Regions:
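A short glycine-rich, Lys/Arg-flanked "PGG" loop and its adjoining helix->strand segment in the class I
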Residues: 45-62
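S-adenosyl-L-methionine
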Residues: 1-46
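Residue-level signal for inorganic ion chemistry
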Residues: 2, 66, 119
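Short, glycine-/aromatic-enriched active-site segment of Class I SAM-dependent methyltransferases
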Residues: 67-84
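Short "lid" loop at the C-terminus of a central beta-strand within the Rossmann-like core
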Residues: 20-21, 67-71, 113-114
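Flexible, glycine-/basic-rich loop-and-beta segments that form/coincide
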Residues: 120-157
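Short alpha-helix
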Residues: 88-102
Length: 157
């Protein structure tokens, strides 16, 4: 799934099929300035901590929030699709609050214009690693409800 153009770029380290929870800074040749995270069948809250350790202070990360892997099973519908806007808001809030609690600032939130394979609406959160947890927080007015409403308005057609 990794774009061929990116795969060929010498600045890019593709870590497909890698359990990021077990990667240490010693496993990577350099401290990362940027990382993108797209995980399946696991909550982002399980991987943000280990991924944070790989970033330089001030490093940034864009993560794909997939409601179907953040919500409890009782909130996931047929074919693994989460349609309820309130569940989308709940899981985004959960991921954002967790990210802040471990020392990330939230720079931006947007919905992905591409639905997941089964039709799930997914979201992109842009994070920045702060030197210490006290500096973490929202760096812009991220309105989760507004982003979810816009996503459903555009993609529920």
């Amino acid at each position: 799934q990794f774009a061929w153009k990116l795969r060929q770029d010498p600045r890019v380290v593709c870590m497909e099929k890698t359990n990021i929870r077990y990667v240490t800074p010693q496993d990577i040749d350099d401290v990362l300035d940027f990382a993108s995270v797209d995980v399946s069948f696991i909550s982002l809250t399980k991987v943000l901590g280990p991924a944070r350790e790989l970033l330089a202070d001030g490093g940034e990360m864009v993560c794909l929030i997939k409601p179907q892997f953040e919500a409890g099973r009782e909130k996931v519908g047929k074919k693994g699709v989460v349609r309820d806007k309130s569940v989308h808001e709940e899981v985004i809030d959960k991921v954002i609050l967790f990210a802040i609690s471990i020392g990330f600032s939230v720079l931006h939130l947007e919905y992905s214009p591409i639905k997941g394979p089964e039709g799930n609406i997914e979201y992109l959160v842009h994070l920045k690693k702060e030197q210490d947890v006290e500096q973490a927080g929202m760096k812009e007015n991220v309105d989760v409800q507004k982003v979810v409403e816009a996503a459903h308005g555009e993609l529920d057609k």
